[in-house]
Amino acid sequence: MFKATARYIRVQPRKARLAAGLMRNRSVVEAQQQLSFSQMKAGRCLKKVLDSAIANAESNENIKRENLCVLEVRVDAGPMFKRMKSKSRGGRAPILKRTSHLTVIVGERGQ
């Protein structure tokens, strides 16, 4: 099993989980194709993390990418940047800029 992570990514976890659903339980070649045609910002971020996990597998254990599949995709919520928006009559409302931690684990089929 080979793991790659990206932390503090400026993508909402809820939207990133939608993109993560495109690559679950697929071979890495299929997952790369799905993410490369995805219009979502989270899809681009997940593709970079997937490419990193594939590179880890190829460089550390000399495993061919055709034998790899996506074992686990995890999207966790990171810290939120808090901003304020002015409202009427001198009030204000919070704006939460959400971040995500992305984790992709790949391995050989049958693990």
From Swiss-Prot:
InterPro entries: Ribosomal_uL22 (IPR001063), Ribosomal_uL22_bac/chlpt-type (IPR005727), Ribosomal_uL22_bac/org-type (IPR047867), Ribosomal_uL22_sf (IPR036394). The keyword rRNA-binding applies. The keyword RNA-binding applies. One of its GO terms (biological process) is translation. Disulfide bonds: none annotated. GO terms for molecular function: rRNA binding; structural constituent of ribosome. GO terms for cellular component: cytosolic large ribosomal subunit. It holds the Pfam family Ribosomal_L22. This protein binds specifically to 23S rRNA; its binding is stimulated by other ribosomal proteins, e.g. L4, L17, and L20. It is important during the early stages of 50S assembly. It makes multiple contacts with different domains of the 23S rRNA in the assembled 50S subunit and ribosome. The globular domain of the protein is located near the polypeptide exit tunnel on the outside of the subunit, while an extended beta-hairpin is found that lines the wall of the exit tunnel in the center of the 70S ribosome. Belongs to the universal ribosomal protein uL22 family. Part of the 50S ribosomal subunit. This is Large ribosomal subunit protein uL22. It comes from Chlamydia trachomatis serovar L2 (strain ATCC VR-902B / DSM 19102 / 434/Bu). The lineage of its organism: Bacteria, Pseudomonadati, Chlamydiota, Chlamydiia, Chlamydiales. The gene is rplV.
